[in-house]
Amino acid sequence: MLEYDTRNDDENIISGNSATHVMTSPVQLDLNPDTSYDVLNDVFNLTATDIAVVAPTDEIMAQFGLDDPFAEVDFDIVGGNFKLLIGNEYVDSDGKVLGRYCYADGINMIYMFNTDTIPWATVMPLDISMTMITSTYIYSISSIDVATADSSTHFELNGDSSDFQVKCSDGDVTADNFKSFYQFILRAPAEELYLEETDAPADITITITHQSGTDKIEFIKSDDRKTIIRLNGRTSFKCRTAYTSRLIENLGHLLNGENMVDTW
């Protein structure tokens, strides 16, 4: 599910993303404004290549795969609701798939649409989303807590680009080095979806308190050289464990006044 990003309406909230909408299901994730454009906007230029059937019966709807559709597209737009059922594929004389049969709710016809005009039939969540789990602007953050099995570190953030300051519970850190550390947090990669719930304790927990609330990112080591990522209580992604290993190392670099390592 994609929903309008209400952060756009709050002048006090600065987001690190320019997309107008966010993904709320199956996971919470910012959209990539470029790759999500067609999914959000093609409904306004939807043009069929042909009409297959006028006034189809229930039996005909079933024949075209529209009684149990391959996909359903539901848009809440200005002026009302638009619903499109996407059914079976149709092919040319050589068996090449050209598109799918579709039915627009309220218009009693079965249409034929080329595949490239109905992106909703093929899109996957990570195709249109940002790979970053969070894009919270650093100057809108009041605190960040990083907890591991061995330690807990609290950072207080104040100021904007002209007077940014950081206070750390474990000693002095420079503003520039902390910015580099936060950039590494932002790069936490949503490399694959993982929706299976787990009650395993987190190996690393990052809590970000900002103008519009709190985000909690938990990293839970798996048994396949990957790490489960739980975002705000929802198991959502997996990433390579190499990232979390480097994250712990970079926390040490930050506290020791050393440069971050960007690769993993």
Residue ranges and their predicted role:
Residues 1-264:
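Secondary-structure "cap/kink" motif recognition
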